Curated annotation (Swiss-Prot):
The active site is at residues 244, 406. The lineage of its organism: Eukaryota, Metazoa, Ecdysozoa, Arthropoda, Hexapoda. This is Adenylyltransferase and sulfurtransferase MOCS3. Its EC number is 2.7.7.80, 2.8.1.11. The gene is Uba4. It comes from Drosophila grimshawi (Hawaiian fruit fly). GO terms for cellular component: cytosol. ATP binds at residues 96, 117, 124-128, 141, 185-186.
Length: 449
């Protein structure tokens, strides 16, 4: 019986070893492919400018065969295709918006594409960032997208900028392109791109998507087309900003908006149709309705695009906005140190003692995972006051300490700040770093999302 049980275990061990060896071979092949793509003439450089744009005067037979379905459009034709072939478009952010935008621009025959993204591919990206694959997890998003785009259209020149765009490198990177697409997911980058586009005289196709909703417009186009600062002179407070990582998004929504960004870029290059300048297109995915609303024209006293601008060079946009220029965790600092407790101290001093653990995430997130004994009270119920009386009664009857937790330690700070304003005498603490800190420091098997 012992031998019989041992045989399957040996076989399982052999299979695990074989899988590990195959994975190593796959990783090596991916690296070889990446190196090969870097050397081919249609590949990418990592320099500060797009590949040298050529003045193509005619289309090749391959071009005619490849782009025939758009060549026969009456308002497009040979002239429109040549304009695309001689154009260069910069896409900032190769995520949920940037992937479909890049895919359609490369497919349509855009001559040069610049891809800007500092980040690497992660599993949580794959449901919406459709240029990337499981095999390329850990690879630069710009490099991963380049591989996919060259497979789609090897005639497209692609320049990768695998770095974080900032005030020091933005002008050098952007100046060689005709159109810029803002596919980022943070406020600081939006202001940076806007100001740089105004200073360089380039149109900015701006898209955003969150949950089931999306928006798109074109800034800095035409004599009366506003820039981003005309609409939003002052950035919102950091605690009011929600990105895809915090609020969630459906992949098909980002695909819809990203494809429309590619469409607007093509229209700008070719001179096709009415450009979406001075208008905001709003997409409601829950009802599949589009609304097209008029937005204000240029602001006469705009700090960057007016006749007498106050901003004539790029500034520190992280300081200006009070938040990082990435879509990564953007930790708030709303509380004093004594109003917070680390996950290590919580486990040592409170977890096994009577206390009230409030999880202020939305119910859908609470159902994904939760700490033992946690009670789900969404942040909205604390801010609107509907739970405060019950909380006060619970504290007065038990005297138990109150610890507040959320996903990353931001919403919990907002909740603690609000509750302390109402009940300054109560023992209320924020669990610093939230559930992400719990996974990283206490229990690596606790789900992270």
């Amino acid at each position: 019986m012992i031998a019989a049980r041992g045989a399957p275990e040996i076989e399982k061990a052999k299979l695990r070893l074989e899988i590990a060896e195959l994975q190593a071979v796959l990783n090596a092949k991916e690296q070889q492919l990446l190196e090969l793509q870097s050397t081919i003439s249609t590949g990418a450089s990592n320099g500060g400018e797009p590949e040298s744009k050529q003045d193509h005067q005619k289309l090749s037979n391959d071009d005619i065969a490849r782009y025939s379905r758009q060549l026969i459009l009456p308002d497009f034709g040979i002239g429109g295709q040549l304009k695309l072939k001689n154009s260069a478009v910069l896409i900032v952010g190769i995520g949920g918006l940037g992937c479909p935008a890049a895919q359609y621009l490369a497919g349509a025959g855009c001559g040069s594409l610049g891809l800007v993204d500092y980040d690497q591919v992660e599993r949580s990206n794959l449901h919406r960032q459709t240029l990337h694959t499981v095999a390329r997890c850990g690879l630069s998003k710009a490099e991963s997208a380049r591989i996919a785009l060259l497979e789609l259209n090897p005639h497209c020149h692609i320049t990768c900028h695998a770095s974080l765009l900032n005030r020091f490198n933005a002008m050098d990177i952007m100046h060689g392109y005709d159109v810029v697409l803002d596919c980022s997911d943070n406020v600081a980058t939006r202001y940076l791109l806007n100001d740089a586009c105004v200073m360089l005289g380039k149109p900015l196709v701006s898209g955003s998507a969150l949950k089931l909703d999306g928006q798109i417009t074109v800034y800095n186009y035409g004599t009366q087309g506003p820039c981003y600062r005309c609409i939003f002179p002052v950035p919102p407070p950091p605690e009011a900003v929600t990105n895809c990582g915090d609020g969630g998004v459906l992949g098909a929504v980002t695909g819809t908006i990203g494809a429309m960004q590619a469409l607007e870029a093509i229209k700008l290059i070719v001179g096709l149709g009415d450009v979406l300048a001075g208008r905001l297109l709003i997409f409601d995915g829950s009802s599949c309705q589009f609304r097209n609303i008029r937005i204000r024209s240029k602001r006469a006293n705009c700090h960057v695009c007016s006749d007498q601008p106050l901003i004539t060079q790029l500034i520190d946009y992280e300081v200006f906005c009070g938040m990082h220029a990435t879509d990564k965790d953007n930790p708030l600092q709303l509380l004093e140190p004594e109003q917070r407790i680390t996950v290590v101290d919580y486990q040592k001093s409170l977890q096994d003692k009577p206390h009230l653990l409030l999880d202020v995430r939305a119910q859908a997130e609470f159902e994904i995972c939760q700490l033992p004994q946690a009670i789900n009270v969404p942040l909205a119920q604390i801010l609107d006051g509907s739970y405060l009386q019950q909380l006060d009664a619970q504290f007065k009857s038990s005297g138990f300490p109150i610890v507040v937790v959320c996903r990353r330690g931001n919403d919990s700070q907002i909740a603690v700040q609000h509750m302390k304003n109402q009940f300054p005498e109560h023992f209320i603490r924020d669990l610093k770093g939230g559930l992400h800190a719990w996974t990283n420091q206490i229990d690596e098997n606790f789900p992270i999302y």
